[in-house]
């Protein structure tokens, strides 16, 4: 059923760095007042970003007649006199100058659109169930550009089923070719853009595509071939920027362009790892969620004590999949783990903050760091991965190598994902699934300790159980200047 709401963006004036935006809402209206608000955060990025700060030139019309659009609170707009209207049109411009994977960016070479930071949503004045209906999205752009977007429709006009799909419909449009390939019947799309207009190295690109195929196939081996048959990867290449954000059936990732250039193996590993991490989020975030994230409240902070699982497990398993698939060699994994261990040992936060506390306080800690943070705070990404590694080693030891934390993740996904009888998880469901897997019966207390206590996981001991040992690198002697 159509929602009667059309969300439009105009990206034809790239030199202005501002998107033209319109929202057209057809009646009926439930009262005389219509209110619209920007989402203040997006899942996967736990920070109140206040996108309304980038809005300008706000105007409104009721049935073609200009009317006042009044700003309300920190995130919204109010229009009155709509009770008998057949159509309300809201227009404004949005500054799109921040080059990150979490923001709008427009210039003469491309546009990257984050729907939550582009379009306001009606929160009062229409029947709330209309937000669950089918919305139309329109993009006006230069003729030579083609668009990566996970929605159905045709170039320049697409349809989103409900609020969440509309907000998660990342848009990347530029003149670069759309690359596509299939893995086990699922179509994969890759859309690249270089911020400096540099030519994308063909050999490095082909190498990345082959790595993508291996990683995707390994995900399917663990979870099964998904019902969704298309996935879109947007990759921005920059001088030094790095980041990634998962979306429904898509991702936007950003890497230094040298990751595709010959001789930059560390950046290459990071690129493959980042792709795998964001791809894995289709199962561990988009489908398997904390119970209080099943229906997102996007106007205020929503806390979870489980980000150590949703990011830490994803970091660990994403890289294990890189290794198992053959996209990484064992040497790649060892070198990347060494890099992580250096970060792990270069801070003291585990004595002051547990993984559950770090997860809960993501809004004020991980996303608001200061120069003293590492003394008393931890990253639920890094330390969550270390905790999962320790659990995995212990589970494999007790099950004679037959089961690991990948099996725990797979069982959780199939039992508690969206669409099942019991969607959503808490610590209790993770614990229950762990102790019920062969070899995990006595690991509940270890799980509780690793995530609930303020102490460092014993990674050295875990490696010894694998018959391996972590050895400190030899210190390089400094130059002698002739003074004693």
Label every model-predicted segment.
Residues 180-307:
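Juxtacatalytic substrate-recognition/specificity segment
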Residues 39, 61, 91-177:
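Extended, low-hydrophobicity, Ser/Thr/Pro/Gly-biased non-transmembrane segments
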Residues 288-296, 301-381, 416-419:
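Acidic/His/Gly-enriched intrinsically disordered linker/tail segments
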Residues 19-52, 120-142:
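Surface-exposed beta-strand/loop patches in extracellular or lumenal glycoproteins
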Residues 11-12, 24, 45-108:
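A surface-exposed beta-strand-loop module
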């Amino acid at each position: 059923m159509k929602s009667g709401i059309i969300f439009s963006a105009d990206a034809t004036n790239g030199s202005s760095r501002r998107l033209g935006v319109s929202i057209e809402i057809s009646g009926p209206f439930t009262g005389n007042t219509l209110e619209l608000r920007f989402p203040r955060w997006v899942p996967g990025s736990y920070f109140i970003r206040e996108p309304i700060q980038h809005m300008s030139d706000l105007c409104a019309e009721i049935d073609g007649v200009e009317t006042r659009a009044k700003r309300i609170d920190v995130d919204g707009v109010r229009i009155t006199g709509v009770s008998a209207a057949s159509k309300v049109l809201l227009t404004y411009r949005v500054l799109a100058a921040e080059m990150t994977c979490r923001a709008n960016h427009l210039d003469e070479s491309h546009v990257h659109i984050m729907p939550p930071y582009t379009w306001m949503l009606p929160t009062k004045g229409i029947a709330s169930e209309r937000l669950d209906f089918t919305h139309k999205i329109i993009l006006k752009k230069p003729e030579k550009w083609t668009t990566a977007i996970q929605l159905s429709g045709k170039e320049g006009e697409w349809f989103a089923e409900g609020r969440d799909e509309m907000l998660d419909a990342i848009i990347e449009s530029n003149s670069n070719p759309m690359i596509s390939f299939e893995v086990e019947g699922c179509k994969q799309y890759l859309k690249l853009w270089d911020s400096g207009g540099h030519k994308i190295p063909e050999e490095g690109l082909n190498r990345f595509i082959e790595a993508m195929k291996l990683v995707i196939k390994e995900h399917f081996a663990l979870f099964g071939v998904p019902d969704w048959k298309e996935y879109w990867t947007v990759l921005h290449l920059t001088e030094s920027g790095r980041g990634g954000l998962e979306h429904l059936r898509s991702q936007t990732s950003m890497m230094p362009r040298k990751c595709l250039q010959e001789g930059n193996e560390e950046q290459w590993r990071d690129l493959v790892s980042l792709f795998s991490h964001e791809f894995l989020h289709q199962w561990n975030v988009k489908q398997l969620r904390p119970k209080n994230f099943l229906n997102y409240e996007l106007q205020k902070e929503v806390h979870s004590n489980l980000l150590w699982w949703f990011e830490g497990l994803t970091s660990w398993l994403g890289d294990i999949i890189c290794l198992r698939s053959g996209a990484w060699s064992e040497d790649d994994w060892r070198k990347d783990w060494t890099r992580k261990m250096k970060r792990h040992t270069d801070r003291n936060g585990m004595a002051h903050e547990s993984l559950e506390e770090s997860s809960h306080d993501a809004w004020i800690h991980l996303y608001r760091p200061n120069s003293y943070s590492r003394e008393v705070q931890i990253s639920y990404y890094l330390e969550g991965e270390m905790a999962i590694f320790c659990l995995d080693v212990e589970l494999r030891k007790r099950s004679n190598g037959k089961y690991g934390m990948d099996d725990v993740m797979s069982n959780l996904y199939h039992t508690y994902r969206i669409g099942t009888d019991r969607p959503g998880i808490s610590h209790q469901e993770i614990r229950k699934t762990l102790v019920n897997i062969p070899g995990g019966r006595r690991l509940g207390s270890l799980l509780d300790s690793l995530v609930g206590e303020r102490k460092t996981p014993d990674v050295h001991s875990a490696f010894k159980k694998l018959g391996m040992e972590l050895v400190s690198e030899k210190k390089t002697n400094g130059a002698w200047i002739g003074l004693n």
